[in-house]
């Protein structure tokens, strides 16, 4: 089965072709980072308009790259939610218009299910069951994954997502957009232990997260720098130490909760997905813990940690392979800006 995947939930336009026999044939991505940078964040209306401009050229790119003709495609998968309503509508409209013109079925995919399954795109994919740590700008969750469509939420953030905390911390420190990668880069130049920040809910006894207090601690520390009248090199060193303190705290919590989930479920495989899954400090800490405690940790390729069409095409192919009745052939569709992943559980 050959599936075309279309991702447009936020500020990346992604298209890809995935074949159940041959794997990922092609994927193309356009990021809107440069466009949104001057505003310090994603502007939903601009995001929607840019998806309209980019989708069809990216479609041409993946078709040419893979040598695929439209007659070869068996189905079209698109991100149905969660995400920005306007951006989702663009992708859904394009997917259903193409499907109508080409006489193909469609299937709407949960964005987080795409992330959750994206490590299956690697050459040696992890077998089920496993624990999934989903960490992105909008979501932080620990899931028990028994099979495609069989998900149990073990823990989730009670306020800010991890990626959101990274972005807000970057803004408080005065870094550019997107903030997550910027604060991570700055942290690598900071001194470990120079600034120690709280580890929210580290000993809560459950698998939930909270990052709002960590963000507040960063703000408090910046006010201390201001009161001390730090400037020049001294201020830059202090900011680097603060970034290091923030990243160390966030990583400690993510790792500790992941280890607790593995212990609670007695599973030996951890999958990490979502944009924060590309963070080098998080990967290093999890790899060290895996070596010490004897479990396997799996990630998607770095290029597929961000939003992308490949994960949507994969999820569509896996769902249609198991439940062909989920194919839509009347081309009526809705989008779901808010959509609980656990609601997909079968």
From Swiss-Prot:
Gene3D superfamilies: 3.30.420.40. Its cofactor is Fe(2+). Binds 1 Fe(2+) ion per subunit. Keywords: Acyltransferase, Cytoplasm, Iron, Metal-binding, Transferase, tRNA processing. Substrate binds at residues 134-138, 167, 180, 279. It comes from the Bacteria. Fe cation binds at residues 111, 115, 307. CDD domains: ASKHA_NBD_TsaD_bac. It is found in: Cytoplasm. The keyword rRNA-binding does not apply. It is an enzyme of class 2 (transferase). InterPro entries: ATPase_NBD, Gcp-like_dom, KAE1/TsaD, TsaD. It catalyses: L-threonylcarbamoyladenylate + adenosine(37) in tRNA = N(6)-L-threonylcarbamoyladenosine(37) in tRNA + AMP + H(+). GO terms for molecular function: iron ion binding; N(6)-L-threonylcarbamoyladenine synthase activity. One of its GO terms (cellular component) is cytoplasm. HAMAP family: TsaD. Belongs to the KAE1 / TsaD family. NCBIfam families: gcp_kae1, T6A_TsaD_YgjD. Required for the formation of a threonylcarbamoyl group on adenosine at position 37 (t(6)A37) in tRNAs that read codons beginning with adenine. Is involved in the transfer of the threonylcarbamoyl moiety of threonylcarbamoyl-AMP (TC-AMP) to the N6 group of A37, together with TsaE and TsaB. TsaD likely plays a direct catalytic role in this reaction. This is tRNA N6-adenosine threonylcarbamoyltransferase. It comes from Burkholderia vietnamiensis (strain G4 / LMG 22486).
